Amino acid sequence: MGVLRLELPTDPRWVNIVEKNIEEILTDHAWCEQKAATNAITIITNNSEHEDLVTDLLALAKEELDHFEQVHDIIKKRGLKLGRERKDDYVNELAQYMKRSNNGSRVSGLVERLLFSAMIEARSCERFKVLSENINDEELSKFYRELMESEAGHYTTFITYARKYGTGIDVEKRWREWIAFEAKVIANYGNKETIHG
């Protein structure tokens, strides 16, 4: 997980909480995938002049919806129910930081949105890794290992475009600041059966 450079790793005991309510983690996970697809489409809508970004984020949005479907299939197969969409306090805190960090220019808006997206993908990827290595459920362990690889690719996509289109912005410095901020935020989580909880 070194490439993601997260400051605060997830305590593996979080998986013990998850295992007590598989329906809750799967429901939360399904909605995380839906929100990730919606986020990618929002970036496309606001930055349609960047043909390469549009092409790659269309593919990413489709993949996120495919993941939503995969999670929903697991829910159905297990006789569980997809609950209502959950509020994600972790993501909301990152979104507030993104808004505060935007200096008002289009370039800054795009870079901050891309770094926000990369941060969520990086943490999700790390959580999937922890799940795959610690959950006592062979099907879910395999599923989360496969998703982990996909999410790492998404993280890379967002960071790559932040670097490419962040003209006049020290993207590496901003990314380090994002990582430091995220560590403070995630320190308050890890005790709920949700992907970022």
Region annotations inferred by a language model:
Residues 1-197:
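Non-heme di-metal
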